[in-house]
Amino acid sequence: RTRFWANRLQGPALAITFDPPPHQVLHPGSERPPLTTLEERAAWLEQAGVDHLIVLQTTRELLSWEAEEFFQRVLVQQLRAKALVEGRDFRFGRQRRGDVILLEQWCCQAGCHFEVVPPVLHEGMPISSSRVRQAVEQGQVELARWLLGRPYSVAGQVVVGARRGQSLGFPTANLDGIRTLLPANGVYAVRVSQDRCHRSKTTAGLPQPGTFAATANPDKAESNNRPPPFPRLGAAHIGPNPTFGEHQRKLEVHLLDFQGDLYGQVLRVEFLARLRDTRRFHSPEELQEQLRRDIEAVRQWREPPGESW
């Protein structure tokens, strides 16, 4: 609907986000991994037809503004908005006093079109970031895919690991520098691709906005190796490795039918289905047999109707 109004009024389609999230400013120490990075958010919005993403630096001063002050200073004076599209449960301003009823009144006074879009439902309940987060935290990646309309994914850089997978005949790529929420511990069928830099039209801050090019991962990949054909199916393990007495939680991925060097490359891992829980095996041979079964399960995975590579 934002794209509709932009076309109708012959202006750019803008989206506004806050960075960092307001709850981190109001409640220091409450940080938790986000579902997406700011750069990923910019890329998804750009794909959806948004021309510019306005990033407001979240400060206590900004959060102290009353709702009408925010409306006047940001939407009217700074952005000169001609149309505004919001969800019915949107709240803003000090102590979340602003709502869509007030927005409609103020937009009418300012000569700004206003539209409230209905929520998108799944099984009779509105889709929200809280539902997505809960699904990911519980390892319900199939549910997360339905809620998002795409597989949930994370990105990280391939680093040197213990190389136990290679000794077992199943080499894995160990991913580091992941900035978003990892699903629950377990083994998953995944789809892996090379994470390319997204160039998104993003405006940071007010009242003096600037533009930056958003990338999916700030770490510079130092590998000059030729990337493998992507996308490629794989089996991913999240969690410690109890069979070898390891306690560190990590993400490692075995790419099906691939041999090569991925060190330094930034990979994106899409979670397609959960295969099983993490468990301790009595011997490396028992682990090998289970890995064979996991890989066969990945080969048997079929894309849900309506989705395509």
Question: Where in the sequence are the language-model features?
Answer:
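ATP-dependent adenylation/nucleotidyltransferase module used to activate substrates
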Residues: 45-47
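Phosphate/ribose-recognition catalytic cores of enzymes acting on nucleotide-derived substrates
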Residues: 162-309
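N-terminal catalytic cores of NTP/NDP-binding nucleotidyl/phosphoryl-transfer enzymes
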Residues: 1-37, 43
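Divalent metal-dependent hydrolysis catalytic cores, especially in the metallo-beta-lactamase
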Residues: 14, 52-56, 82-86
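Solvent-exposed alpha-helix faces
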Residues: 3, 7, 149, 291-296
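Classical nucleotidyltransferase
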Residues: 61-171, 278-292
